[in-house]
A protein has these predicted regions:
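Extended, low-polarity segments enriched in aliphatic/aromatic residues
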Residues: 2-53, 57-61, 67, 72-80, ...
């Protein structure tokens, strides 16, 4: 496969060129205007952020993108699907309220905001791809029915996939609630009894009441209630909750790649990633821990695989923030420069496997040329 072009701009500004201007210049240079947007419904896939989390992409960027697309003749809308876990984005009413709380509304975003899989997450299209792991991914109807897909991705760490970028935003984010259940279906966690301290944090934070402490003061999971969302794995500071046997981060990343293929199949698509506020974990949490590296910039490409690889490489090469974050607080952190920061934070994950599978199924290539704008 040929090398893909990934365009990048840093975050330096001048009075005549602010960050919104730089983003617009970046995507134009990357060729977004080569897509025929005339009278096309364009889904701008973005994560609205769980209330309390402040690392999500600012709505100002979404508004500038919507205005640019409308000027190109498009009918854009911001969109995301409901969550599997029962937080404040698990149904369309709460999800829209959360989006508005975080600044996403038709006035600020310059376009409508649509929850793609409907009120209760039951509105979806099955898109047949005959994948190795997913035969017919369940994609939110508003996304499946859109003519063009634009992803706006906050690049950060992720407790189950290593990092979250374009593939995660598209593959997991565009899945309906039932689709997310399929993605997580083989990834129910387990309790390592020897490591469990009985601290009760997983019990307190399980939104499905699937965990309790037994008579030995050890956590136990009720697999009849567990949906495999993995929040207990992310919360546990003692490696007491871990990925289940017979399942791996690799398998989840494989499925995400195949869901991404379903989302993009047969449609023009373009992707922008914001390498800012690179927090250790997903924006689905109601908090965001301190960034692990300095803010780096914005990148764009027609190839989501190349884009994710370029962003990962930049974060790995970047210096660790000097103080006050998960990596700088680690012993001997001065020796971690140039190491795989995602694996350091989440040692049970393997983000490389997802990119390899995405490449295998034709989503793009990991070979890229980085062009600075």
């Amino acid at each position: 496969m040929e090398t893909s072009k990934v365009y990048f701009t840093n975050l330096r500004t001048t009075p005549s060129s602010n960050l919104l201007d730089k983003m617009e210049r970046l995507v134009k240079r990357a060729g977004i205007a080569n897509i025929d947007f005339q009278n096309q419904f364009v889904a701008i896939k973005i994560h609205f952020g769980e209330p309390g989390n402040l690392a999500f992409i600012r709505p100002n960027y979404a508004a500038r993108m919507a205005t640019l697309l409308r000027n190109l003749g498009a009918k854009p809308f911001l969109t995301d699907c409901n969550t599997l876990y029962s937080g404040r984005r698990a149904n369309a009413v709460d999800h829209l309220e959360s989006a508005m709380e975080n600044g996403f509304n038709p006035f600020s975003a310059k376009c409508d905001v649509i929850i793609a899989d409907g009120l209760k997450g039951t509105e979806y299209r099955e898109i047949e791809i005959d994948g190795e792991y997913c035969k017919a991914p369940k994609i939110g109807s508003a996304i499946a029915d859109a003519d063009i897909i634009i992803s706006m991705n906050h690049f950060k760490g992720h407790e189950q996939t290593g990092f979250g970028g374009a593939l995660k935003n598209l593959g997991m984010g565009c899945a309906s609630v039932g689709g997310k259940l399929e993605l997580h279906s083989a990834s129910q966690p387990r309790i390592d009894i020897e490591s469990c301290k009985g601290c009760n944090i997983c019990v307190k934070h399980c939104r499905h009441d699937a965990i309790h402490l037994n008579a030995s003061h050890k956590a136990e999971i009720d697999y009849g209630k567990c949906v495999g969302c993995g929040q207990c794995v992310a919360l546990c500071q003692y490696d007491g909750a871990v990925m289940g046997e017979g399942d791996t981060s690799e398998r989840l990343n494989y499925k995400i790649a195949e869901y991404t293929k379903a989302v993009l199949s047969g449609k023009p698509n373009f992707h922008i990633s914001f390498i800012m506020n690179v927090s250790p974990e997903c924006d689905c949490w109601n908090h965001n821990d301190a960034a692990i590296v300095p803010d780096l910039g914005i990148a764009a490409s027609f190839d989501p695989v190349a884009l994710d690889k370029a962003c990962a490489d930049m974060v790995i090469k970047a210096p660790i923030q000097e103080t006050g974050n998960r990596l700088s607080d680690a012993p001997h952190h001065e020796h971690l420069e140039g190491c795989d920061k995602f694996h350091l934070m989440h040692p049970d994950t393997n983000w490389q496997a997802g990119l390899e599978h995405a490449e295998k199924i034709g989503l793009g290539t990991q070979k890229y040329e980085l062009i600075t704008v």
